[in-house]
Amino acid sequence: MASKVIVIALLCIALAAFVQGAPQYTHGEEPEYDEDDGADEPVQPHSSSNHADTEDDFDLSLLDKPYANAPENADPGRRPEFLKQHNNENQSDSSSGSTEN
């Protein structure tokens, strides 16, 4: 029984090696690539961007607003006050649990 399993495993390995070693294209055939649709179109800026602004004229308050239609709590790492509030909630929960004992 074990010898049959070993033979089947070796045949599977040989088949996998044969399939992996097969050429993808026949001799002389050139691969076809997808067309780059829209490659010549200009990149559209974000709706809140202003081309007249330079780095010096950039309004830093825009960084506090959520990007596009993303929910405000999508990236709490950018808002340290969220982390402070979250830590305070955890501390109050742990302290209330210890007073019940």
UniProtKB/Swiss-Prot annotation:
Disulfide bonds: none
Disordered: annotated segments: 26-101
A single GO molecular function term of this UniProt record: toxin activity
Subcellular location: Secreted
Keywords: Blood coagulation cascade inhibiting toxin, Glycoprotein, Hemostasis impairing toxin, Secreted, Signal, Toxin
Signal peptide coordinates: 1-21
Any one of the GO CC terms: extracellular region
Subunit and interaction comment: Interacts with human F2 (thrombin); the interaction results in thrombin inhibition.
Family in the record: Belongs to the anophelin family.
Described function: Salivary protein with anticoagulant activity that inhibits host thrombin (F2).
Name of the protein: Salivary thrombin inhibitor anophelin
Source organism of this protein record: Anopheles stephensi
